[in-house]
Amino acid sequence: MLLLTEAVKPALTDCSCHARSARGCYRPCATVGAIVYAFSMQLHNYFRSSASHRVRIALELKGLQYEYAAIHIARGDHKKTPYTALSADTLVPLLEVDGEKLSQSMAIIEYLDEKYPTPALLPADSVGRARVRALAQSIACDIHPINNLRIIKYLVTELKLEDAAKNAWYSHWCREGLEAFERQLAQRPASTFCHGDLPTLADCCLAPQIFNAHRFNVSVEGLPRTMAAYAACMALPAFQKAHPSNCPDFEP
């Protein structure tokens, strides 16, 4: 993650661009004197978004510098200009790179893996790639969609669910999905990460899901392979740097 340093922030006091935050100007055109601070990638994301979290992990694993553009989903920033002019689906994450606007976390990560193949986030063999994608999609396609903020908000505002019922909904589907994930891991010999001894796309998806499981007090007991892989992930600096608590827009 590439952010403007404390030393240059005072020079940006008069910056008139829209992309300001408490930590300075996060716009690729930001200038300080005669120096232009150019960013090759700009990630529009929200610290608490699982999909955004996945992409941050991938960027950190590959050692890629990027500009962090905070979009506060809970406050509805994704439904306001100027973001609506950038994102067709008004969701996060959105990666601006090489003049293109890429959406959907899984597509973004696969783009990064093709563009910057080292370290690889997918195995070299076709069966291994299929297995890693299946593990990743069991989280990104089975658990996440029915438990994301849009769904939870609808349950509360439209269906009038109380907090207890809302949390029961989240816990049920999250736990059921993690149990299925554990069974998939158990089909193969034990490994450090979800697939083998290096982190893959599956681990990029797992870590954010466990973060949210902890946040909603979902039990992770009886998931030994899953939690061992998660522990291995969180021992790596890349996963630590990408963690929501280390994001510039983090809120407790």
Please describe what each predicted stretch is.
Residues 26, 33-166:
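GST-like domain detector, emphasizing the conserved glutathione-binding G-site
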Residues 113, 209-210, 243:
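Active-site-flanking alpha-helical
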Residues 1-11:
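Extreme N-terminal basic, low-complexity initiation segments
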Residues 226-252:
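Long hydrophobic alpha-helical segments typical of transmembrane helices together
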Residues 15-17, 25, 29:
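Cysteine-centered motifs
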Residues 139-235:
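GST-like fold's C-terminal all-alpha helical module
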